[in-house]
């Protein structure tokens, strides 16, 4: 018998290991509702640009310091693991000192999101996107953070089916809600029909499907397709 705590850990592990794929569907929104979505997306773009400007300022200050550049050089040219570990600690300390951290990025987005009237989950998701860009600059081959141009509208992502864009089932159909706007989807071919039906089947009995997924992971070290919606 698996305890509740172990069950949650295994389910989280399954979600990390399992494959993901994107299903693109059209909504049945009216043109006026589509315009509202465009307005929201532009607000997210503006909020993101404001956060990018703030984080780029701190990042530029950090990389201009001789000590940070020296530490980066030593870290990249040292093979000794213990020395690299010590250098990594020093680099992280400097990143904290100059507010180039995920925590600072996340908390800075809170007042910015409120300023533009953006739902907290959309603001958090945008902050995560920006932080991934910062990580590329810090640890990979990214050169600089970029602003989103006018009409370069970002996706509106909620990540969770009960926040931001709640998903529900009504009359055996997927229903969504964005703010006060409710809408469905258009299913145009057999592939989309099969995919949507698989999602509906999961939503009817999520615990049963999750249990099967966990048992398969434990017994066969294999991830089955559950069609759990995550967006």
Question: What would you call each of these model-derived segments?
Answer:
Residues 1-231:
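Nucleic-acid substrate recognition interfaces
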């Amino acid at each position: 018998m698996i305890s509740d705590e172990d069950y949650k850990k295994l389910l989280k592990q399954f979600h990390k290991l399992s494959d993901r794929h994107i299903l693109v569907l059209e909504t049945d929104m009216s043109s006026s509702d589509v315009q509202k979505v465009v307005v929201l997306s532009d607000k997210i773009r503006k909020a993101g640009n404001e956060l990018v400007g703030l984080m780029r300022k701190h990042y530029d200050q950090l990389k201009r310091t001789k000590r940070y550049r020296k530490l980066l050089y030593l870290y990249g040219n040292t093979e000794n693991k213990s020395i690299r570990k010590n250098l990594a600690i020093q680099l992280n300390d400097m990143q904290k000192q100059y507010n180039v951290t995920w925590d600072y990025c996340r908390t800075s987005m809170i007042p910015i999101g409120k300023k533009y009237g953006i739902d907290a989950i959309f603001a958090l998701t945008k902050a995560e996107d920006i932080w991934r860009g910062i990580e590329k600059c810090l640890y990979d081959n990214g050169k600089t953070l970029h602003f989103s141009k006018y009409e370069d509208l970002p996706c509106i992502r909620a990540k969770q089916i009960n926040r931001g864009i709640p998903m529900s089932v009504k009359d055996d159909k997927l229903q969504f809600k964005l703010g006060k706007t409710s809408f469905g989807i258009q299913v145009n071919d057999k592939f989309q029909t099969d995919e949507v039906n698989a999602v509906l089947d999961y939503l009817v009995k999520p615990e049963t499907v999750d249990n099967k997924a966990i048992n398969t992971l434990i017994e066969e070290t294999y991830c089955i397709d559950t069609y759990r919606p995550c967006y």
